[in-house]
Structure formats: structure tokens, C-alpha cells
Swiss-Prot record:
Belongs to the TRAFAC class translation factor GTPase superfamily. Classic translation factor GTPase family. IF-2 subfamily. Gene3D superfamilies: 1.10.10.2480, P-loop containing nucleotide triphosphate hydrolases, Translation factors, Translation initiation factor IF- 2, domain 3. Residues 563-566 are annotated as: G4. Residues 191-207, 282-291 have a biased composition (Polar residues). One of the essential components for the initiation of protein synthesis. Protects formylmethionyl-tRNA from spontaneous hydrolysis and promotes its binding to the 30S ribosomal subunits. Also involved in the hydrolysis of GTP during the formation of the 70S ribosomal complex. The keyword Cytoplasm applies. The keyword Repeat does not apply. Residues 322-338 have a biased composition (Low complexity). This is Translation initiation factor IF-2. It comes from Streptococcus pyogenes serotype M4 (strain MGAS10750). Residues 509-512 are annotated as: G3. GO terms for cellular component: cytosol.
Length: 953
């Protein structure tokens, strides 16, 4: 037999090759493309099937027509069918059940094998064209119907469809005429092909097909409309309740005012009416709330009867829940019919039939009346403070011409403009600098007036060198400490407290030498009363005038003590006249200053002086609050070898306790221990009490203020901040070379400099010595202080001196053995002194180049005190052992304790056992006594030395 290609068949019948290929596949032919060949019989079958599909179905309809029950029913069915045809042509199905298609395809292949190719899958035709494979209608179950070869079986199925009793076809009935004619023709030809006609199978029911998606959308829209109606009703009910409540409240107020104006007896009736109004308000609120809740509950409950019945169903299918239908979409994930089924575990199936969630009403927040802002606030921070969305603020800023994001910082002007736009009064927040402890001394608003009590006066003793300041203080304390001062002058501030007539007085002893100007100014700044001591035989001296100026600058009252009236040349009247020239006028002359003539050496009129001090203090009304955190001033500071930094503090306000976190100057720490002026440990210090504390991380400067903080964290932060600011200020003071000072800079390079390193026992001495050396004026030569610090001379000082070619000046300190050995090796000169004007004179003469032959100190040896013996009417004898060199009878000795010189003097006696000897050699033991010194202690170092005259070349 000859074969034909599919594209030739398509050309012959006037169809596209694609349609012919698909049609051949549906007829069960094994073809792949338009180039595939088929037998002549199969080609005729394809052509005949196309010609049959194009014939009108009027005859078939007329043939089936007598079997219909009633003519009106057929007319309705035909109309309904035509509607479905038009709808199916427009709309496309949303999903395919691939599993069902695979099963149906497998059944088709099995049926073809049994029927030997005589049974083929029916094809839905519309207008002569085959529907696409994935174009499934809602009647997907009727798509694949396989007929058996027996004619009676096919007739039974057709009859069952026509009688509308099949359980598999609940929603449809066949348009019997056309289907039966095709079924008979297929039975005669031996092929059981159930082809769908151009008019398509019409549903059995009289109503159109149910569009579940449209129904779900309509249901959701209906629910939303119902909810909005209920929200509006609820809102109107609430507004009405508020209006009624407001009217009731106004009526109650008017009734109350009227009753009060008419007669006081009607007050009870007014109160009763107010109570009734409040009850009415509560009942209206409750009723409105209950109505809203009930309506909300009704709206949220779904209507169960919506899916129970089909509005056009008849017979047994009516009132049947969830009936099975082959026209129903098999993939029912988005179907309302699936709402009562349990969701499989692990499947996130969204239920589309749930009632819509109510929209949460946004709360309205009122804007604040005032807004306190800080520089650099972000948009998000401002939005949070005024309870607005950041996007709203960004929009307002954009309208103002400012482009900003919610994390961008704004300046003060922009924030104020923004607040003006909102109608809010903007105020800049005043930030308190926690690192500024000076504010406590300027502003006393933090004090509690109820806790203020009287405090002890702080008295500073001022005067010229050797006018008797320390002797007076020694007499007041009943001790002989004045003899211990080198050269008869005080080298640093001493703070002491005495008690007179049941009241305490705090004394500050300041040095009188010109080098200690800053220390005298410091003493005047913390004092309440100044005692100006003037020698009756010397009169007014330069340091006396300076003390007067310091006291006047501090604004403190002055009490003049004319000392040494026991001397033969004493002339108190001359002193009074000289002081009057500087504004210090006695009360006897009509002035304001008290004058007291005393003799500190013989304890004359000392009681009168103390009474005068207490009288002036009472007039000044000195007060303090002991309940606040302590503040005060550093009197002196030094570095101890074993204890570290030690600071002498004067408490001015509050009470200082042990373990208090404290900031002192540019350093910080915690009060580890407190010692009073008598050397006893104390746990607290009240106002006007001097104490020495330990526990600071660095040595502060004398004159620095201190303040106690709430916790150690705050103290550490404040101390570090103050240290950072001080370093920044020091860097800013560095001089830069410019065209104006270029000549001066070049000229300064030609000047010779003398580099010095200063080490002293206390901070005040370091400051005084450095300031004095810098002030020395010698043409062509100047002093450069390379380094100054508190403590003994150590190896690092020697290394620095070698690098900078400097001279080390030790004031009341000694070098360590390692430092001395390194200085000898590196040829570094160390000058040790105990009197400040000796240092100044030596440096000045060296600068002028007029140094005469000088005496050089030569150390003979060192000894350690092993034991002390106190002998009455003789003094203290020290048993010693020589550890280096020798100790001679005519040598001078220094008593060194913790690398600090305690005393410098001559030997009174030197013995080896009971014999007087001229010297005691190395590793030998002996005993010694020192002139005018009895405070020897075990482990003190005795350094023996002599002064050798050398000629300077």
C-alpha cells in the first residue's frame, strides 16, 4: 500500500500541519512530525474525521429530540449549553491535574491494545479545531470516556447519561441528540470514539457552571463590605455615645452650678444627678461595646450553608454536602471545597476562605508642648521623642529643603525649624561637663541649706624669711619642729590643726622665701584668715609686701602679729606705721586690721592671738555642708618609694571617707588610706581638716582641686578626660616659627643653654626651684629645665642627663646606689642641695662664669643603724655598722630615710665599744651621736662626707 506524509494531507484538506499532527496523535497513530508517513487507510481516516467534525449537528439534535421529556426543558438546556460554549472559548483553565492525565493516558493505551487499535481517545472539537491538551474545563472527568466494543454497553451508558442518574456525572447532562448519533455511528464502524461536538457537552443541571474563584472573590468582597459597614456602625455608635456622654456631663455641670448658686442645700441633688450621668455614660459605653462585639462575631463566622447546595440542583443531589463531581477541579489547593479537610503535615497551605483580619486602628499621639534637644540628634531619635514616624519627618525636612535620612544627624538650627513646623517650643539641653570639678567651687547651689553647720577657720601664716612663722606654729603645737628646717626656712607647706576653747583651728605654714611665691599664693587661695607675721626689729620686708598683696587678692581678713618684741631693738610702732603705707591700718588708728604683739619664742600673748582668730572667724560666719561629697584643694604632693603618690588635701566642703572614688587635678584614684596631721589613721575628714591620702595613680600638682565622685567608673572617665585636655592644651602652647618671630628664633639659636634636671622631695619645691632657675638673667646664657619630678634620683634620670648633657640637681633627695654608679661611669654631674638659694646662687655664678674655687663633697663611707639607745639628759645613741668606706670623727653626716635626707649635721661623738675613736673602718661596729638630732631609727642610713676645696680651672 502507498503512504502519505502528514503535510501532504494538511495541504489537501486545507489545514495546518500542526493541527493534522496533533489530530493523528489523538487518533492513536504513531507520528512524530509533519514529515511522518501514514498508511492510505489511516490517511482516509484522518480526512474523514476532519470532514465529520465540520458537519452541522442539526440532524443529530432532531434525532434525539423525541427522547426528551419536555420541550421547554430541551430549550433551556440548549441555551445553557451555548452559554457554556462561549464562556469556555474565552476563559482558559487555571490548572491541570497531570496525575489524572497520566492515568487516563495509561488506560487509553491499554484499551487500544485490547481493541487492536479500534478504540481511540475522543477529542473535543470546537468549530472544527481540536482543543489544546492542557485546555481542561471544569468537567475534567468527562474528558476521557472509553467505549467498549459491545453496542448494548454503549447504549446503556448513553441512556444513563440521558436519564441523569449516573454517580460520576453529577453536574452535567448530555445534549442527547448529537451524542447518540455519534455513538451509533461509531458502534457501526467498530470504533468507540466519544468525540466532543462543536456545541460541547452541556451540563445536566439547568444552571450555569460554578466559577469557584469568582465566588470566593465575591464572598471576600461581601465580607469586607460587611466589615466596613460594621466598623462604620460601631464608629457611629461610639461617637453617639461620646456625644451623649458629653451632653450628659454638660447638663450635670450646669445643674450643679445652678444648684450651688441657688442654695447650698441642693448640693446633694446635684451630686445625685452627676452620679446618674456617669451611670448613663458607663451603660452607653458598655452597650456600644457589646453591640460592636456581637456584630464582629457574626461577621467573622463563615456562612456554612453557602456550599451545602447548588442553587439549580434537583432530585437526589439537592442538600447534599460536598458531592463528587468530575467537572470539579482536581487540584483543589485554592478551592473553598477543601476548607474542611486537614492539611497534610509539612504542607504550608494557605486557607483563602478565612475571614479578613480587621485593620488595626492607629493610635494618635499628641505632640509635646516642649522639646529639649541636643546638638547632633538623628531623625530617628527626634521621631521617637515626638511620637511620629521617621518618614514623616524626612518628608518635612525635604519640604524645608534639607535632604536627610533617618540616621543622619541634624544641627541645632534645623531641629528648631522642624519643631517650629510642628508647633513645638524647642530648647537646647544644657549639658553638664562631668570632668569640670571647678564648677563646685564657683556654684554652691548643690549645698543643702538645712545641713549647713559652722566649720573651723583655715588660717595661713605669712611673712618674710626668718621672721618666726614656723616658730609660732611650733609654739602653737607645743613641739620643736622648727629646728629641723634646713637653713632656718620652711621648704614646703605644712598643714596642722589645733584646738582652742573647744573650737578647732587649721593652720597652714607657708615658706617665706621669694622662690615660693606660687606656694604663698596657693596658701592664700584656700585660707579664711591670714596671720601676717612681722619681726619688730626688721620691719616690713619684700616678702611681707608680697604676702599683703596675696591676701588682698584673695579677699581674706588680715591679722598682724608683731613678733620678736622681746629683742632689744624691737620697735612695734615703726612696724605699724610702715604697714599703714600699704593699706594695713590698725583698729587703734581707725582701720579694720587687728594687731597683736607676740613673742613666739617665749610664748607671750599667744592666747590673745588665738582669741583674735576665733573672733574674726565668728564675724566671717564660716559655714560648710558635711553631708555632700567632699571637695577641696591639694596643699602638697610627693612621691613615696613604698606608698606611691601621697597628696596632702584640705577638705573645704563635705566629708571625705576612705574608699571614696576621687579626682585630683588631672589624675584619679580611690582613697586607700588617710592620715591626719598627727600621723594617725582616720576613716573620715570633715570640712577644714587637712589629711594625707594614698591611692592615686599619679602625683598631682600642688594647688589642684579635688572632688569625690559617685562611683569609680565616673571618676576614671573624668580623670582621663581632664588628662587628655591638659595634654591637648600643652600641645597647643607649642610655638610655631613665623615670619614675625623668625629673627628671634635665629637669635635664640646662638644663645648658650645650661640644661638641668631637677628632682625634689615635694612638688612645691620642684615648682619653686624650676621657676627660680628659669628667671635667672645672664646675657648670652639661659637655663633649660629638661625634666623635673618628685622622688629620688634614679637611673633613668642619669640616662636622660647623659643624652641631653644636663646637670642633675637634687633637692632634699639622694641618688640610688645604681644611679650613683651609673653617673660615675657616664661622667654625669649630680649636685645635691638642701637650701634653695644656694642652688640659685651656684647656677647663677656658673652661668656668669665667675665661679671661684668651690668645695666639692667627698663621701667617706656609709653606715646602717642597727639599734638605738635613749639615754636621759644625753640623747639618742645609734649603734651602727659600716657597710662602705669609713666614718671619721670630724666628718659631716646625713641621716637618710627612704632615699630622703632627714637631717644634715655634725657628729657629737664617735665610739668603738666604750672607747672614743677618730674613725670606724669598713665592716666594723660602733656608736655615734649627732648634734641637735635625736630622731634616729633602725635601718636609717648614715652617710659620712667631708668638703674638699678644689680649684676650678
Amino acid at each position: 500500500m502507498s503512504k502519505k506524509r502528514l503535510h501532504e494531507i494538511a495541504k489537501e484538506i486545507g489545514k495546518s500541519s500542526k493541527e493534522v499532527v496533533e489530530h493523528a496523535k489523538y487518533l492513536g497513530l504513531d507520528v512524530k512530525s509533519h514529515a511522518s508517513s501514514v498508511e492510505e487507510a489511516d490517511a482516509k481516516k484522518i480526512i474523514s474525521s476532519f470532514s465529520k467534525a465540520s458537519k452541522p449537528d442539526v440532524t443529530a439534535s432532531q434525532t434525539v429530540k423525541p427522547k426528551e421529556v419536555a420541550q421547554p426543558s430541551v430549550t433551556v438546556v440548549k441555551e445553557t449549553g451555548s452559554e457554556h460554549v462561549e464562556k469556555t472559548q474565552v476563559s482558559k483553565p487555571k490548572s491541570r491535574n497531570f496525575k489524572a492525565e497520566r492515568e487516563a493516558r495509561a488506560k487509553e493505551q491499554a484499551a487500544r491494545k485490547q481493541a487492536n487499535g479500534s478504540s481511540h481517545r475522543s477529542q473535543e472539537r470546537r468549530g472544527g479545531y481540536r482543543q489544546p491538551n492542557n485546555h481542561q474545563t471544569n468537567e475534567q472527568g468527562d474528558k476521557r470516556i472509553t467505549h467498549r466494543s459491545q453496542g448494548d454497553t454503549n447504549d446503556k451508558r448513553i441512556d444513563r447519561k440521558a436519564s441523569n442518574v449516573s454517580p460520576r456525572h453529577d453536574n452535567h447532562q448530555l445534549v442527547g441528540d448529537r451524542n447518540r448519533s455519534f455513538a451509533k455511528e461509531n458502534h457501526k464502524n467498530g470504533r468507540f470514539t466519544n468525540q466532543k461536538k462543536q456545541g460541547r457537552q452541556e451540563p445536566q443541571s439547568k444552571s450555569p457552571k460554578i466559577d469557584f474563584k469568582a465566588r470566593a472573590a465575591a464572598l471576600k468582597a461581601e465580607q469586607n463590605a460587611e466589615y466596613s459597614r460594621q466598623s462604620e456602625t460601631r464608629f457611629r455608635a461610639q461617637q453617639e455615645a461620646k456625644r451623649l456622654a458629653e451632653l450628659a456631663r454638660q447638663e450635670a455641670k450646669e445643674a450643679a452650678l445652678k444648684a450651688q448658686a441657688e442654695e447650698m442645700s441642693h448640693r446633694e441633688a446635684a451630686l445625685k444627678s452627676i452620679e446618674e450621668a456617669e451611670t448613663k455614660l458607663k451603660s452607653s459605653n458598655i452597650s456600644a461595646k457589646s453591640t460592636a462585639d456581637n456584630r464582629r462575631k457574626k461577621q467573622a463566622r463563615p456562612e456554612k450553608n453557602r456550599e451545602l447546595t447548588h442553587h439549580s440542583q434537583e432530585g437526589q443531589k439537592k442538600n447534599k454536602k460536598s458531592w463528587n463531581s468530575q467537572n470539579q477541579v482536581r487540584n483543589q489547593k485554592n478551592s473553598n471545597w477543601n476548607k474542611n479537610k486537614k492539611t497534610k503535615k509539612g504542607k504550608n497551605v494557605k486557607n483563602t476562605n478565612t475571614a479578613p483580619k480587621p485593620v488595626t486602628e492607629r493610635k494618635f499621639h499628641e505632640l509635646p508642648k516642649e522639646f529639649e534637644y541636643t546638638e547632633g540628634m538623628t531623625v530617628a531619635e527626634i521621631a521617637k521623642r515626638i511620637k511620629r514616624e521617621p518618614a514623616e519627618i524626612v518628608k518635612k525636612l525635604f519640604m524645608m529643603g534639607v535632604m536627610a535620612t533617618q540616621n543622619q544627624s541634624l544641627d541645632g538650627d534645623t531641629i528648631e525649624l522642624l519643631m517650629v513646623d510642628y508647633g513645638i517650643e524647642a530648647k537646647a539641653k544644657v549639658e553638664v561637663d562631668d570632668a569640670d570639678i571647678e564648677r563646685f567651687f564657683e556654684d554652691e547651689n548643690y549645698l543643702n541649706p538645712e545641713n549647713i553647720v559652722e566649720r573651723a577657720p583655715v588660717v595661713t601664716i605669712m611673712g618674710h624669711v626668718d621672721h618666726g612663722k614656723t616658730t609660732l606654729l611650733d609654739t602653737l603645737r607645743n613641739s620643736r619642729v622648727a629646728t629641723g628646717e634646713a637653713g632656718g626656712i620652711t621648704q614646703h607647706i605644712g598643714a596642722y590643726q589645733i584646738e582652742e576653747a573647744g573650737k578647732k583651728i587649721t593652720f597652714l605654714d607657708t615658706p617665706g622665701h621669694a622662690a615660693f611665691t606660687s606656694m604663698r599664693a596657693r596658701g592664700a587661695s584656700v585660707t579664711d584668715i591670714t596671720i601676717l607675721i612681722v619681726a619688730a626689729d626688721d620691719g616690713v620686708m619684700p616678702q611681707t609686701i608680697e604676702a599683703i598683696n596675696h591676701s588682698k587678692a584673695a579677699g581674706v581678713p588680715i591679722i598682724v602679729a608683731i613678733n620678736k618684741i622681746d629683742k632689744p631693738g624691737a620697735n612695734p610702732e615703726r612696724v605699724i606705721a610702715e604697714l599703714a603705707e600699704y593699706g594695713i591700718i590698725s583698729t587703734a588708728w581707725g582701720g579694720e586690721c587687728e594687731f597683736v604683739e607676740i613673742s613666739a619664742k617665749f610664748n607671750k600673748n599667744i592666747d590673745e592671738l588665738l582669741e583674735t582668730v576665733l573672733l574674726v572667724a565668728e564675724v566671717e560666719e564660716l559655714k560648710a555642708d558635711p553631708t555632700v561629697r567632699a571637695i577641696g584643694t591639694v596643699i602638697e604632693a610627693r612621691l613615696d618609694k613604698g606608698k606611691g603618690a601621697i597628696a596632702t588635701l584640705l577638705v573645704q566642703q563635705g566629708t571625705l571617707h576612705v574608699q571614696d572614688p576621687i579626682v585630683v587635678g588631672n589624675t584619679f584614684g580611690r582613697v586607700r588610706a588617710m592620715v591626719n596631721d598627727l600621723g594617725r589613721r582616720v576613716k573620715s575628714a570633715e570640712p577644714s581638716t587637712p589629711v594625707s591620702i594614698t591611692g592615686l595613680n599619679e602625683t598631682p600638682m600642688a594647688g589642684d582641686h579635688f572632688a569625690v565622685y559617685a562611683d569609680e567608673k565616673a571618676a576614671r572617665a573624668a580623670g582621663e578626660e581632664r588628662s587628655k585636655r591638659a595634654l591637648l592644651k600643652q600641645r597647643q602652647n607649642t610655638q610655631r616659627v613665623s615670619l614675625d618671630n623668625l629673627f628671634d628664633t635665629l637669635k635664640a639659636g646662638e644663645i648658650k643653654t645650661v640644661n638641668v634636671i631637677i628632682k625634689a622631695d615635694v612638688q612645691g619645691s620642684v615648682e619653686a626651684l624650676a621657676a627660680s632657675l628659669v628667671k635667672i638673667e645672664v646675657e648670652g646664657v639661659r637655663v633649660n629645665v629638661v625634666h623635673s619630678a618628685v622622688g629620688a634620683i634614679n637611673e633613668s634620670d642619669v640616662t636622660l642627663a647623659e643624652a641631653s648633657n644636663a646637670v642633675i640637681i637634687g633637692f632634699n633627695v639622694r641618688p640610688t646606689p645604681q644611679a650613683r654608679q651609673q653617673a660615675d661611669t657616664d661622667d654625669v654631674e649630680i649636685r645635691l642641695h638642701s637650701i634653695i638659694y644656694k642652688v640659685i646662687e651656684e647656677v647663677e655664678e656658673a652661668m656668669k662664669g665667675k665661679l671661684d674655687p668651690v668645695y666639692q663633697e667627698k663621701v667617706l663611707g656609709e653606715a646602717i643603724i642597727r639599734e638605738t639607745f635613749k639615754v636621759s639628759k644625753v640623747g639618742t645613741i645609734g649603734g651602727f655598722m659600716v657597710i662602705n668606706g669609713k666614718v671619721t670623727r670630724d666628718s659631716s653626716v646625713r641621716v637618710i630615710r627612704d632615699s630622703v635626707v632627714i637631717f644634715d649635721g655634725k657628729l657629737a661623738s664617735l665610739k668603738h665599744y666604750k672607747d672614743d675613736v677618730k674613725e670606724v673602718g669598713n665592716a666594723q661596729e660602733g656608736g655615734l651621736m649627732i648634734e641637735n638630732f635625736n630622731d634616729l631609727k633602725v635601718d636609717d642610713t648614715i652617710e659620712a662626707y667631708i668638703m674638699e676645696e678644689i680649684v676650678r680651672k
